[in-house]
Amino acid sequence: MNTLNNINIEALAEQIVSRLTVEVEASGRHVHLSRAHLEALFGPGAQLTRVKDLSQPGQFVCAQRVTLEGPRGSIPNVVVLGPERKESQVEISLTDGVALGITPPVRLSGDIGGTPGVTLRYGDRAVRLDHGLIAAKRHVHMTPADAARFGVENGREVRLKCLTDRPLTLEGVEVRVSPQFATFAHIDYDEANACGFKKGDRALILP
């Protein structure tokens, strides 16, 4: 009986944690390419080669890789994510920016006006972006149902208490709500390393 009770208590505890928290994902450096830049790097008629799907519906990892080049250094083997974008965009960490010699502003994906550029290289082909380099602002993707459950709305900033090996609370986490999203919190590898993140970790949403 005690064993059954313990199992029931553990199952209930897991349900409660799941209801009160969101799963966290660490997002590494990556590139989104426009049609023009995809062809400039990989040849006329080039298509993105899907390798695996990401947690957000319609987003996927591609086989294509590029090298980022800045005034101080370069970063090879940077993954391209699909699908194609209207404008090319590069997301890196602040630490990556030091390696490149470029300071990326902290922005949400898609907010690339007035941002610095970077050179993308594949073999002997290169594209110089005059803008589009950012460090992604920490954020939470949410379905409308989950946003209602947590009592938040699109554009609101919350705190994220990471329940990790080195717990910490992240401020200024922007909520992004859409029926096209799956509910996940996204941090970069600087933040993930700081809190001892490992795959499957969760976080509390705090006001």
Language-model segments: which ranges?
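Protein-protein interaction and targeting regions used for scaffolding, dimerization, and localization
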Residues: 1-21
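Short amphipathic
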Residues: 21-31
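Short beta-strand-centered segments at strand-helix junctions
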Residues: 30-71, 76-123, 128-161, 172-202, ...
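Acidic, glycine-rich active-site loops and adjacent beta-strand->loop/helix elements
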Residues: 164
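Short coil-to-beta-strand transition motifs
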Residues: 167-169
